[in-house]
Amino acid sequence: MKFKKVVLGMCLIASVLVFPVTIKANACCDEYLQTPAAPHDIDSKLPHKLSWSADNPTNTDVNTHYWLFKQAEKILAKDVNHMRANLMNELKKFDKQIAQGIYDADHKNPYYDTSTFLSHFYNPDRDNTYLPGFANAKITGAKYFNQSVTDYREGKFDTAFYKLGLAIHYYTDISQPMHANNFTAISYPPGYHCAYENYVDTIKHNYQATEDMVAKRFCSDDVKDWLYENAKRAKADYPKIVNAKTKKSYLVGNSEWKKDTVEPTGARLRDSQQTLAGFLEFWSKKTNE
């Protein structure tokens, strides 16, 4: 079956898998589409451009993941010590491979799960994606992070940095509150996920890395803990972005939801840059062990 502009996870033009299951909405945790909407009803609510994804490998205007990576680089460029200088040089040298990994995560199998994007979501409280039993962003991001470290140690630098790009994609996915609470493109109200991410693309330039920003680190030597903590921080902001007021505003077609979400979104973008900077330093540390 084909739906235009929407799949279960993200907002792309692609085939979707239709799962023969019934899922009840639960307002206290994961939110799902309460009453299945007809394809034309969903389509009418969706914007006619791709959402917060990786729509071009190196165009930050339409690639929020890569934009966050470039902001993280700016943060790392301050207070450069020997290890950080080496990391910065390598990130610059292998920028193309990193960018391609970030991009492919949204456009190639097995990374985008045949257009369902199941592995791009992760609820840290339930330790699952939006369909329990499938690989989530914590598991998938950790897998490519660890493969990247192994490839680097073996001198396979092109694949190491490509897989680092994949890991960056999953890590930054769950720094978005909707992804950290399994609120998908067809969660109620259908299309709000996509509209919100498109809105982020229009305002993110207001929240670039500044001199006072530092790399934020989590106190763990396990990358799964890093992904968990990153999602936990994002989920804490979920009620500020998805609530009764913002849903109603979106459904009636006014822009009040944008005004209500701009402040928490800006704070979320800044935090995402800083935790990603820490994530990159953590990766560098692991490659040198």
UniProtKB/Swiss-Prot annotation:
Query: For this protein, what is the EC number?
Result: 3.1.4.3
Q: Does the keyword Metal-binding apply?
A: yes
Q: Which CDD domains match?
A: Zn_dep_PLPC
Q: Which residues form the signal peptide?
A: 1-25
Q: Which sites bind Zn(2+) 1?
A: W52, H65, D173
Cofactor needs? Zn(2+)
Q: Which reaction does it catalyse?
A: a 1,2-diacyl-sn-glycero-3-phosphocholine + H2O = phosphocholine + a 1,2-diacyl-sn-glycerol + H(+); 1,2-dihexadecanoyl-sn-glycero-3-phosphocholine + H2O = 1,2-dihexadecanoyl-sn-glycerol + phosphocholine + H(+); 1-hexadecanoyl-2-(9Z-octadecenoyl)-sn-glycero-3-phosphocholine + H2O = 1-hexadecanoyl-2-(9Z-octadecenoyl)-sn-glycerol + phosphocholine + H(+); 1,2-di-(9Z-octadecenoyl)-sn-glycero-3-phosphocholine + H2O = 1,2-di-(9Z-octadecenoyl)-sn-glycerol + phosphocholine + H(+)
**InterPro entries hit by this protein:** PLipase_C/P1_nuclease_dom_sf, PLPC/GPLD1, Zn_PLipaseC
Places the protein is found: Secreted
Q: Which superkingdom heads the taxonomic lineage of this protein's source?
A: Bacteria
Give the cofactor note: Enzymatic activity is specifically dependent on the presence of Zn ions, since Cd(2+), Cu(2+), Ni(2+), Co(2+), Fe(2+), Mn(2+), Ca(2+) and Mg(2+) cannot substitute. Binds 3 Zn(2+) ions per subunit.
Grouped into one coarse class, the protein's main location is secreted
Keywords annotated in UniProt: Hydrolase, Metal-binding, Secreted, Signal, Virulence, Zinc, Zymogen
Q: Name one Pfam family in it.
A: Zn_dep_PLPC
Which residues get removed as pro-piece?
Answer: 26-51
| Record's subunit section | Forms monomers, dimers and higher order oligomers, but only the monomer is enzymatically active.
Question: Which protein family is it in?
Answer: Belongs to the bacterial zinc-metallophospholipase C family.
**What is the stated purpose of this protein?**
Major virulence factor whose phospholipase activity facilitates pore formation by the pore-forming toxin listeriolysin O (LLO), leading to vacuolar membrane disruption and vacuolar escape of L.monocytogenes, which enables the bacterium to spread in the host. Acts as a phospholipase C exhibiting broad substrate specificity, with the highest activities towards diacylglycerophospholipids with phosphocholine, phosphoserine, and phosphoethanolamine head groups, but less towards phosphoglycerol or phosphoinositol head groups. Is also able to hydrolyze sphingomyelin and plasmenylethanolamine.
Q: What is this protein called?
A: Phospholipase C
Q: What is the lineage of its organism?
A: Bacteria, Bacillati, Bacillota, Bacilli, Bacillales
List the gene name: plcB
